[in-house]
Amino acid sequence: MRFLPVRALPKPERLRYLFSFDFDDTLFTLGGPAEERSIFFRTMRMLRSQYGVLWGVNTGRDPVYLREGLADMFRDDAEAFAPDFTVTMERNVHLADAEGRLMPGAAWNDDCAVAHDSLFTRYGGMLESLMGQLESRFSGLGLRRQGNDAFSLVVDDAYGLDEVSCVIQDTVGPYEEIVTQRAGPYLRFSHRDYNKGTSLSFVASRFGIPSSHVAIFGDGHNDLDAMRHLPEAFRCCPSNAAQEVKDMVARGHGYISPEPRTRGVLDGLAHGVFPYFGMKAEVLKEDI
């Protein structure tokens, strides 16, 4: 993550708030208007200087795929600056160093790797058998094999994961250490102790920011862990969010935007986050 075209800004004198954004279909709209991205960065610059707000991306993308996405988001935008943190694959943490480069959160990532190596060593045979059964049972399902993500899959239709997830749960339910992370048409097996929620808690603790000063933006099933794990945080989702996410937002301190994706983030800042935290701020917009 250190080779991004732009770097994070110097830290504010006082770190007061932490805003965490899911990437795909929340913060980033593929092919979306460049003006929306520019509005976001101008607004975050203002919040940083006036209210000590840090921000980051909390995603299921792997580091390489996120780097590509961030490069698209930064392209041709003079206001763009890198996030203060990223969480990739729902579990691997990178934090901006003094020079604004995103560097691995060594202790957390090392412990995470050990936990997953142990998990997949002990249960790899069972998971291999399960994935073979899923591949033969469900059309349009593909297995994804990567060195850092050995047990994951993708389906043609995100809604098809409902039935797939039920079959998976019947098999892995008795194994408390094994959970699944689901985002759109993607699903991966992982260790229960490492998810968007526990990763975000680690990030907040490193910055010394209490969970009551955290805002979580997300649209997918894997965002539920963050909202559950930090119940005092403010929650926000765009209109395209999964129904389970909307239900979670409605049950806590939160705001469901009537706008989708990036527009939903900008609307959520203006009509959700700012009033909740008492920020006398506005989204620096023209027309969105």
Put a short name on every predicted segment.
Residues R14, S190, G197-I288:
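Mg2+-dependent phosphoryl-transfer enzymes with acidic/Ser/Thr/Gly-rich catalytic loops
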Residues T26:
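Short acidic, Gly/Ser-rich segments with clustered Asp/Glu that frequently serve as metal-coordination loops
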